[in-house]
C-alpha cells in the first residue's frame, strides 16, 4: 500500500455561543482546523486533524496547509504506509508545528489501522484502560451566575468533574469558583485552569484563597516558560499542580520533572506533535511517579478520536481519578462525521473500528469549507 495523494481542507467551525471558551490566553469563539486526507493506491484514505490556534501553538491554517502541501507531501508521496514510523521521523525533521505534524501522524496511523483491520490503540500497545473514559466539562470566563448554571446543568447530565477558567480578574474569579462550588455541591470534583495567567507570587496568594473550595488541582498557574516559578508555587502553596502549556515536548517534560514543578502533566496528540510522542511523555512521567492527564484544544471528531486511542493505550492516564478533557465535539452544533464520537453521562467511548474509527464524508467536509450549512448529527447515544 503506497501513498498516492495528500489533500488538505481548511475548516472553520463556530463554537456554540453558550459555551465558547474565554481564558487568560484569549477568546475562542471560532475553531479553525486543517483536515488532512492521505490516500493510497489501494483506495484507502487516512484522516488527520490539526486544530490551529496561533495564541496557543503559533500555527495558522495557511501555515499548516503550506507545510503539509509544500514540504510533507513530497516526502510522503509514493512511500509505503507500512513504513509509517520512518515517515513520521521524516515529518519530525521540521521544527515545532506540533499540531500540523500530529495531523499527518493521525492520518498515517488511521491508514495503518485500516490496513491491519484494528483500532489505533492496538497499534500503540493495546488497551490498558477501559474503553469508556470519564471526562470533565470546561467552562470559560463567564459571569459567576452563568458559570454556576452551566456547571450545575452538566452535573445533572452526568459529569462528575468541572473545570473553570480563571486568571485576569482575581475578585470575579473567586466569586465564580465560589458560585460553582455552591451549585455543584461538595462531592463533584472541581479544578481551575489559569492558562499561565498568574505570576508565581500571585499564584501562591490566589491558591490560598481557594483552599476552602477543595480544588483537586490548579492547572498551569504560571506562564509556560516559568517552570521554576511553577515549582515554587507547588512547594509554597501546597496545592496539587498540573503542567499543561509548559509541556509541548519531552525535553520540557524532563525539565518539569527535574524541577519538581508538577504533580500531573497534561498531554494530548496535537500539543505534543502526535500520539506517539505524547505516549513517550506519558511513559517518562510514569517513571517519575507523575500521573498524566489529557488536555484539549477543542478538537473536532478526528482529533478527539486520536485522544481516545491515546487515553486507552496509556495506563498512566488515570481518567478514573482525574477525568480528562476529551470534550471538543460537545462545543459544536454541527457534527459532519458519518459516525461521530459517542458521549454519554460524563464519559466518551473509544472507537473500536479499524484505524481511528471515524468515517468522514468528503462532500460534507467540502460543504464546511465553503461555509454552507451541514446537517447536524447527535453525538449522544
Task: Describe each region flagged by the PLM.
Residues 95, 105-140:
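Glycine-rich, aromatic-flanked loop segments that form ligand/cofactor-binding clefts
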Residues 125-237:
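Metal-dependent enolase-superfamily TIM-barrel catalytic cores that perform enediolate-based chemistry
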Residues 74, 208, 214, 225-242, ...:
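Shared catalytic-loop signature of beta/alpha-barrel
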Residues 3, 36, 43, 72, ...:
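Conserved, mostly hydrophobic/aromatic
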Residues 46-48, 133-139, 162-164, 188-194, ...:
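Hydrophobic faces of well-ordered beta-strands that scaffold small-molecule active sites
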Residues 1-45, 50-55, 329-334:
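Structured beta-strand/loop patches that form or line metal/cofactor-binding pockets in enzymes
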Residues 5-6, 39-115:
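Metal- or metallocofactor-binding catalytic centers and their adjacent structured scaffolds
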Residues 331-381:
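C-terminal extensions of enzymes
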Amino acid at each position: 500500500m503506497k501513498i498516492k495523494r495528500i489533500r488538505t481542507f481548511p475548516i472553520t467551525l463556530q463554537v456554540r455561543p453558550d459555551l465558547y471558551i474565554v481564558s487568560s490566553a484569549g477568546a475562542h469563539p471560532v475553531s479553525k482546523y486543517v483536515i488532512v486526507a492521505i490516500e493510497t493506491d489501494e483506495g484507502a484514505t487516512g484522516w488527520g486533524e490539526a486544530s490551529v490556534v496561533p495564541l496557543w501553538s503559533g500555527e495558522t491554517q495557511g501555515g499548516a496547509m503550506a507545510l503539509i502541501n509544500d514540504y510533507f507531501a513530497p516526502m510522503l508521496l509514493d512511500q509505503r504506509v507500512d513504513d509509517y514510523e520512518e515517515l513520521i521521523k521524516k515529518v519530525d525533521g521540521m521544527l515545532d508545528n506540533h499540531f500540523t505534524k500530529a495531523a499527518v501522524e493521525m492520518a498515517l496511523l488511521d491508514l495503518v489501522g485500516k490496513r491491519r483491520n484494528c483500532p489505533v490503540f492496538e497499534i500503540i500497545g493495546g488497551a490498558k484502560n477501559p474503553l469508556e473514559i470519564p471526562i470533565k466539562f470546561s467552562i470559560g470566563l463567564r459571569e459567576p451566575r452563568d458559570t454556576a448554571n452551566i456547571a450545575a446543568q452538566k452535573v445533572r447530565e452526568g459529569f462528575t468533574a468541572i473545570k473553570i477558567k480563571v486568571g485576569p480578574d482575581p475578585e470575579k474569579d473567586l466569586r465564580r469558583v465560589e458560585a460553582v462550588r455552591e451549585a455543584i455541591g461538595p462531592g463533584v470534583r472541581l479544578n481551575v485552569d489559569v492558562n499561565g495567567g498568574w505570576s508565581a507570587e500571585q499564584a501562591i496568594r490566589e491558591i490560598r484563597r481557594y483552599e476552602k473550595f477543595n480544588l483537586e488541582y490548579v492547572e498551569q498557574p504560571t506562564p509556560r516558560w516559568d517552570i521554576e516559578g511553577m515549582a515554587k508555587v507547588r512547594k509554597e502553596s501546597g496545592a496539587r499542580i498540573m503542567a499543561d502549556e509548559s509541556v509541548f515536548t519531552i525535553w520540557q517534560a524532563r525539565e518539569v520533572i527535574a524541577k519538581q514543578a508538577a504533580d500531573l502533566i497534561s498531554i494530548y496528540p496535537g500539543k505534543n506533535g502526535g500520539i506517539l510522542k505524547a505516549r513517550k511523555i506519558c511513559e517518562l512521567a510514569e517513571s517519575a511517579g507523575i500521573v498524566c492527564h489529557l488536555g484539549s484544544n477543542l478538537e473536532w471528531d478526528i482529533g478527539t478520536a486520536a485522544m481516545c486511542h491515546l487515553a486507552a493505550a496509556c495506563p498512566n492516564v488515570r481518567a478514573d481519578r482525574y477525568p480528562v478533557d476529551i470534550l471538543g465535539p460537545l462545543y459544536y452544533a454541527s457534527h459532519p462525521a458519518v459516525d461521530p464520537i459517542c458521549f454519554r453521562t460524563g464519559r466518551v467511548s473509544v472507537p473500536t473500528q479499524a484505524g481511528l474509527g471515524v468515517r468522514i464524508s468528503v462532500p460534507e467536509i467540502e460543504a464546511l469549507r465553503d461555509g454552507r450549512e451541514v446537517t447536524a448529527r447527535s453525538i449522544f447515544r
